């Protein structure tokens, strides 16, 4: 278990920002975050983050993932000084951080995001992960056994492209296949 004080972070704002689509919400301010072949249980209590990882895992993976090296206090302060509109935006989104996610997953979710909404994008990401990704089961304290699917590699998507119709991607299927072919 790793605990850290972090100002200017709000897990609920990040979850609803349209920046992440694979987080599993357990309840307000408590999530499971799949990342590669592992998952992190994280809970926020005001400015305190309680994470199911070791100190070493935090600094190897999650420090960068949550952009802990950036001074969000200064960014927020600078944005507030621009004008009244930016002040309102800075107040409303003061807990959002730029997450350092897997690049391939970000490219695919960006392609999925055309002409749709956040719940639909989440459903498509989950469906692609279930059809083409690797299933993981993990026991987590207070959560029990949780099943999640690793976001697939471009090779895994191409190997399973005949199964993508189950994902209900529509015209996005050809875009995803084309992107995977370009990457491989």
Predicted regions and their residues:
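HhH-family (HhH-GPD) DNA N-glycosylase catalytic core used in base-excision repair
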Residues: 1-184
């Amino acid at each position: 278990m790793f605990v850290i004080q972090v100002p200017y972070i709000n897990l609920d704002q990040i979850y609803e920002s349209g920046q992440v689509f694979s987080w599993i919400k357990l309840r307000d301010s408590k999530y499971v975050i799949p990342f590669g072949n592992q998952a992190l249980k994280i809970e926020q209590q005001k400015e305190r983050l309680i994470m199911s990882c070791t100190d070493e895992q935090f600094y190897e993976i999650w420090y960068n993932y949550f952009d802990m090296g950036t001074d969000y206090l200064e960014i927020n302060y600078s944005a507030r000084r621009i004008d009244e509109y930016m002040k309102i935006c800075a107040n409303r989104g003061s807990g959002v951080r730029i997450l350092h996610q897997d690049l391939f997953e970000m490219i695919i979710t960006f392609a999925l995001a055309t002409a749709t909404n956040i719940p639909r994008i989440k459903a498509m990401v989950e469906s692609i992960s279930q059809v083409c990704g690797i299933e993981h089961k993990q026991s987590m304290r207070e959560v029990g056994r949780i099943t999640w699917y690793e976001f697939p590699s471009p090779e895994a998507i191409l190997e399973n492209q005949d199964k993508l119709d189950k994902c209900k991607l529509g015209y996005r299927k050809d875009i995803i296949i084309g992107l995977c072919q370009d990457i491989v």
